[in-house]
């Protein structure tokens, strides 16, 4: 029996063979692709847009940079990056083709298609040469990866020396009472929204469970350091509902 089938990981609160998780996650995002952006607005009250703006503020894109936007889905991060960096280019890499289809349509509508590439790929085995990109971003995607450490190692590999990693992800609130209140909202409201808006309760149940399984801010920062990154820092957003993590390939 191979390691991939004998080892297990989590899919939300379920324990599944490692070899099955990627396909299960692919199924989730295939089902929610057409409603993904709408649901993000509903789930966060639009606050995810402010978090992404904060990501760009800290990232400070520069003209001519090459961005790799992993789990970039519908292109939200790439569009923001390109608007702030004339002459920059972005590659959106996602394992779910239907998410990329949504992104391409948005790029065409925004007349940005000539600055974007769209690639189907796995965050744990990126189809790019080493030392290729100036910036690597992943927004609300790394918690869905089967082996997070492998994805961080790949981020380090494809970045040029001096390149920067920036991760936006849901995190853990430091205040237990606030975490309790947020959990009540997440588990009782978001799956219902998923049923009403996307006719898919189960996918959104998985998404909220995956948030609770993701490491806290300090643990995740240590994982980034383990991949080889230096100057690792993080910033809490909305009191820790989400967090930005930054690291440099130095």
UniProtKB/Swiss-Prot annotation:
Question: Pfam families under this entry?
Answer: Ubie_methyltran
Q: Which GO terms describe its biological process?
A: aerobic respiration; menaquinone biosynthetic process; methylation
Q: Where are the transmembrane segments?
A: none
Q: Give the catalytic activity.
A: a 2-demethylmenaquinol + S-adenosyl-L-methionine = a menaquinol + S-adenosyl-L-homocysteine + H(+); a 2-methoxy-6-(all-trans-polyprenyl)benzene-1,4-diol + S-adenosyl-L-methionine = a 5-methoxy-2-methyl-3-(all-trans-polyprenyl)benzene-1,4-diol + S-adenosyl-L-homocysteine + H(+)
Transferase in keyword set: yes
For S-adenosyl-L-methionine, which residues are the binding ones? 74, 94, 122-123, 139
The enzyme class is transferase
What InterPro entries does the database record attribute to this sequence? SAM-dependent_MTases_sf, UbiE/COQ5_MeTrFase, UbiE/COQ5_MeTrFase_CS
Query: HAMAP family this protein is in?
Result: MenG_UbiE_methyltr
Q: What does this protein do?
A: Methyltransferase required for the conversion of demethylmenaquinol (DMKH2) to menaquinol (MKH2) and the conversion of 2-polyprenyl-6-methoxy-1,4-benzoquinol (DDMQH2) to 2-polyprenyl-3-methyl-6-methoxy-1,4-benzoquinol (DMQH2).
Name-wise, this protein is Ubiquinone/menaquinone biosynthesis C-methyltransferase UbiE
Whose protein is this, by species? Cereibacter sphaeroides (strain ATCC 17023 / DSM 158 / JCM 6121 / CCUG 31486 / LMG 2827 / NBRC 12203 / NCIMB 8253 / ATH 2.4.1.)
The taxonomic lineage of its organism, from the top, reads: Bacteria, Pseudomonadati, Pseudomonadota, Alphaproteobacteria, Rhodobacterales
């Amino acid at each position: 029996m191979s390691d991939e089938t004998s080892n297990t990981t989590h899919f939300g609160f379920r324990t599944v063979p490692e070899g099955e998780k990627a396909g299960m996650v692919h199924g989730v995002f295939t089902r929610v692709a057409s409603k993904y952006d709408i649901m993000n607005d509903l789930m966060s009250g639009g606050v995810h847009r402010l978090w992404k703006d904060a990501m760009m503020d800290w990232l400070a894109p520069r003209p001519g940079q090459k961005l790799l936007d992993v789990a970039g889905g519908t292109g939200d991060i790439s569009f923001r990056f390109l608007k702030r960096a004339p002459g920059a280019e972005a590659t959106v890499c996602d394992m779910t083709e239907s998410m990329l289809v949504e992104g391409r349509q948005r790029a065409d509508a925004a007349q940005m298609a000539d600055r974007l590439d769209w690639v189907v790929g796995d965050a744990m085995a990126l189809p790019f040469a080493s030392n290729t990109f100036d910036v690597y971003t992943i927004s609300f995607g790394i918690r869905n990866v089967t082996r997070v450490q492998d994805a961080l190692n790949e981020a380090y590999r494809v970045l040029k020396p001096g390149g920067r990693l920036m991760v936006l992800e849901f995190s853990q609130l430091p205040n237990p009472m606030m975490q309790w209140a947020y959990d009540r909202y997440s588990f009782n409201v978001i799956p219902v929204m998923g049923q009403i808006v996307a006719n898919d309760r189960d996918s959104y149940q998985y998404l909220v469970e995956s948030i609770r399984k993701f490491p806290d801010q300090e643990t995740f920062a240590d994982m980034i350091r383990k991949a080889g990154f230096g100057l690792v820092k993080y910033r809490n957003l909305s009191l820790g509902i989400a967090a930005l993590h930054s690291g440099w390939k130095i």
